[in-house]
């Protein structure tokens, strides 16, 4: 570079090469100043954006946060596990006698309350193991939840009202008088089964378990196949029950000796839940959800005594 400058300045005259050198010098200086400035400038917006994004993340609500605040989670029903007293612990004396009578009426309704029954059923046909079995509407689970409002009759019911309804609809008969020995005995038996259970608390196993909706619409034709395979051996191919010594060993599921159209079991939803949890007898929960709904639909498709509340 020094030699080039010497040659350009030897004669003291202007040389075109001066222009090239001047432009080159300007470009070099500009690059020294511009490149760091550009580098610094390119970082600043990114930093500002990052800070802005971070601030937004701290101030903006999470997706659906407003929905969670405006729609609180539904209350979860807490259940308490309970085991009824063993029959060997049934008390003695007059109270014990009344409790035993209540059990006999419950299990052998056709014998001990025959004049109040209008079909071939016993209470134990729907409330298994003498009203003790969980998930088959056990007496101990019902007793502690009354008095209670029931949408079925649109009023607050006593436990005696609930028992009366069973006689009227499930047994297609006449409710016992509220001051009768039958009513007192059944109430005493229920009271004893609930010994130690907390009043007003939802006990695990009360009523029938909640059953999932079926994958497909319940179908009576599919249900007929389920019935033939799993139910007919006990309830008969015609569904009219099986008798031993003039008494039903296995109850009729439809026809004149079955529950009437006002009974809770006439609801396909209730019947499906009962069947899923308890049927075939001794093999509860062996049917699929779909099978339980289908066979309940099949049972419900048959004729039975009318609901006494419906005027002819």
Role assignments for model-derived ranges:
Residues 94-130, 214-250, 268:
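Sequence/structural segment immediately N-terminal to covalent heme-attachment motifs in c-type
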Residues 112-114, 130-136, 193-198, 233, ...:
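Secretory-pathway/luminal and periplasmic proteins that interact with or process carbohydrate-rich
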Residues 124-133, 191, 234-241, 254, ...:
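Detector for the c-type heme attachment site
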Residues 121, 125, 181, 185-188, ...:
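Amphipathic alpha-helical interaction segments
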Residues 96-101, 105, 133-176, 186, ...:
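Extracytoplasmic electron-transfer domains, predominantly the class I c-type cytochrome c fold
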Residues 2-103, 109, 147-220:
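Post-cleavage N-terminal segment of exported redox proteins
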